[in-house]
Amino acid sequence: MCCLCKSLRRWSLSLLTCSLLAGSLSAQTDNEVQPDRPDHSEGTSVLSPRRLQIEWGIGASSGAHNMGLMLRYGLVPDLELRLEGLLQRPHRGAVQVSDLTLSSKLALFSGDGWIPAMTLVGYLNYAPLEEARRVTGDLTLALEQELVSGLSLTCNIGSAEGMRRLSLTAELGYNFTDRLSSFVEYYGVFGPAEHGCDLGLSYAVTKDFLVDLSCGR
């Protein structure tokens, strides 16, 4: 995601999150929840017009607790807008807003055979705790391919820290049932290099409500 390199530092030891998602404000019923949390990789799914999705999560690490919120809204076919914020509370300190991100997600290709689905994500990041370069912009290209039934591979390549670093992710996702799924993921930034990995489980309570649990370092 947009704050990948910051996440590497923030979760240098461990991460435990639980995310809740709520579905559509429109009359549509054919769309299932496909979250962009809690992993670092951007998926290729884009919300249909007038659909609102709320993604909320809480987490903990060796240095702080945090709470993140993402609002996703389908603007027109193949395009959604997102607003994401992160509140952080150090173990010794006050609650503070560490990141605020406005982003757009554009579906480029839905995928066909062995040609993967492709989505382009653009970010405008505001980091009030940074002394310099508080406002930055980044881009990410997301690719997703189903390998066999129930098993998919998602890869991201993009920029980080205002186009100053390269970010890469690779994620394998597996659906055990229609409701229960899992993922294992590598993520990293380069220049200089930092690496991490995480894994998680997701369970669809209903078609419009999903909970997830993840951990990593």
Question: Where are the model-predicted features located?
Answer:
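Transmembrane beta-barrel domains of Gram-negative outer membranes and organellar outer membranes
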Residues: A27-R217
